């Protein structure tokens, strides 16, 4: 069964990118922070893809890929780093992110809870081509690990979409520089609809946003009814780790991601409704979200069951003048000119095919390449979500006025590994 645009707010049923340096006249995209200015703008040479075995038999693993454009082995797998036992199979590898100093890679297991396993995995990547698994951790009040926000002095904030039982409320877990969990925020979470998925921050404004997506357990067959999708943005006092405002977007069915606009003096952000196909401009100060673009108007238009093509994850370059997105059902990766945030204009599109299933996207630090993975989530015989994709990894070259697929980079996770087809999801590079 596919997810449907049905939403109810159930009560709880069961027991940072990185900090933006306050530099005068310069603001970097929240998902481009970390390291020195030179590191941020250097073209990466190593690509990491966090993936799982499609058969759910072999260990989850980190694929290390040659990402050096000058290399004759560009696009080839260098090695894999399997997660060691216990708890190393069928975690449903999801998102991952480097620490601010780029020496630690944190990865999430979306469905680790179903097997009683730890769901947050840490790798030492100080030697880029030879990562070393460190350990796995877990929340005490939360689960269903999603996105990571690296902290400037080390550590991470981590969106945990569900409670300890996969229900509501979720939390934002905090890990310190020693990678020890020190808190699960907020101390008094909202009881209704708090299931954080996306996360974005501008510490120089003392501002953080999270986006609520879905009550996780509602996607399982054992829970009657359709998946309970959310449509809301939480505005946080970043320093106090406290929610100060909720922006409800009733028609935005499934607010999977949110991105603050780098350098925007009003601290505005973009989000999109996965099932309504609309892009919203969020004003945290005013507590508003207005429709500024309809993905039904993307050219070429691909007719699919979900309105707007099923827009999922977002990315923004350091300039804050472009918004990139992946449309899972339409099989497209697009770019909008958002130099006027209230009037986005399409400036680029790459069509991968309706069966491709692009989901996760990640810009290189120099904003010149976009990595795309074709897989969202398939709960197989135990759940209602079946969005498989074709398991390919793509590189798209990003120009100011267009997007262009890199024909040299061809990587198919169906055939790349001796253990059999794998599901690629999380993306990072160094």
Tell me the role of every PLM-derived stretch.
Residues 305-386, 393:
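Loop/turn-rich, solvent-exposed surfaces of beta-rich toroidal or solenoidal domains
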Residues 34-38, 84-100, 140-154, 190-205, ...:
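Beta-rich, blade/repeat-based domains predominating
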Residues 99, 191-195, 199-336:
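Beta-propeller domains
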